[in-house]
Amino acid sequence: MALDIDTAALLLDQLGNQTRLRIVRLLVRAGEEGRTVGDLQRAIEIPASTLSHHLSHLRSAGLVWQERQGTVLNCFVAFKKVSELVDFLTAECCVDVPAGNVHRRAAG
C-alpha cells in the first residue's frame, strides 16, 4: 500500500534524528539477521536508556520491530516500511520535466 503524505512526514520526522537514523542504517546493514539491543548500544555508544527511548520511537512509527529470544532482545528494520518510504519519495521523480530533458547530474 502506498504511503500518504502524513505517514511519510511522520516517518521522515523519526528519521530526522541522527541517533534514530544511525539505528535504522545499522539494522538495514544487518539484513534479516537483525542486531541485538546490546550490539546496537555498543555500535552507537549510547546509554541503554537512551537507546530504548529511540527504539520506542522507531517501533511506534513502524520502522523497527523487536523479537525476544530468551534473554536477548533482537531488533530488525521493517524493510517493507522503509521501501514504501523510498517509493513515496521517488514516485513522481521527473514527472514535470519534458521528455528528453532529463539529465542526471553527478553528485558532488
Please report, for each region that a protein language model flagged, where it lies by residue.
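N-terminal helix-turn-helix DNA-binding core of bacterial DNA-binding proteins
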Residues: 6-47, 69-82
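Short glycine/serine/threonine-biased micro-segments
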Residues: 14, 54, 60, 68
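Amphipathic alpha-helical dimerization/coiled-coil segments
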Residues: 1-7, 25-29, 79-108
